[in-house]
A protein has these predicted regions:
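Class I S-adenosyl-L-methionine
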Residues: 1-53
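A short acidic, often aromatic-flanked loop/helix-cap motif at beta-alpha or helix-coil junctions
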Residues: 6-11, 85-88, 141-145, 176-177
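Short, well-ordered secondary-structure micro-motifs
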Residues: 13, 38, 66-69, 89-91, ...
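Short, hinge-like loop/turn segments at secondary-structure boundaries
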Residues: 17-19, 45-46, 70-75, 127, ...
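A contiguous loop/helix-start segment that scaffolds small-molecule binding in enzyme catalytic cores
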Residues: 20-24, 103-178
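Gly/Ser/Thr-rich loops at beta-strand to alpha-helix junctions
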Residues: 32-35, 62, 115-116
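Class I SAM-dependent methyltransferase SAM-binding "motif I" and its flanking Rossmann-like core
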Residues: 42-100
Length: 178
């Protein structure tokens, strides 16, 4: 069965009818981890509401792998999902996340649809403070994997094509290094 962000709650509850009959089922995601920035979260919520046992299975998570390889604060971090598509709203959100990173010494992770990655990176380099660190982790676990962390000032000297490549972005403005 196919589930996407446009599915209605009534429709999604049908996915669990077989579970109510005692049949074990699995939830897979076409990219990433099920239910994390993924419409599968609605299925999991309905399962809990219907007292259906939910068992997470261990597997690779690009979010955690990016955080592990970033060199940024792994003690205090937040995953923010997708930033707004609207340019003005996205730019405001980037500033808000940078402030949050500085105020709480918290690494901020987010993702973008692969065909908008290049624009997001340009916005980061335009908006963030020159000393804010940015990690770009793309194609994680693929032969073309690229994971680098630099300051905004350093990133401005690098030409990187992220178009249609799955990527995680992390920013961190360390209050101790300002």
């Amino acid at each position: 069965m196919l589930l996407d962000k446009y599915a209605e709650e009534i429709e999604t509850s049908k996915y669990l009818d077989v579970c109510k009959q005692g049949v074990n089922v699995g939830l897979l995601s076409e990219a990433g981890v099920p239910a994390i920035a993924d419409p599968g979260a609605s299925i999991v919520k309905i399962a809990h509401e219907n007292n259906i046992r939910v068992i997470p299975l261990v597997g690779p998570s690009s979010i955690i792998m990016a955080m592990m390889s970033s060199g940024m604060n792994g003690q205090n971090f937040a995953f923010n999902g997708y930033l707004p598509i609207d340019k003005s709203k996205r730019q405001k959100e980037i500033k808000k996340l940078e402030k949050k990173s500085y105020d709480y010494n918290q690494s901020q992770l987010f993702i973008e649809t692969p065909y908008r990655n290049d624009q997001l990176l340009q916005d980061l380099l335009k908006i963030l403070d020159r000393n804010t660190e940015v990690c770009v982790a793309c194609d994680i676990s693929l032969p073309t994997e690229y994971i680098k962390t630099f300051t905004v000032q350093q990133w401005k000297k690098i030409k990187l094509d992220l178009h249609k490549r799955p990527a995680i972005f992390i920013i961190h403005k360390d209050p101790l290094s300002v």
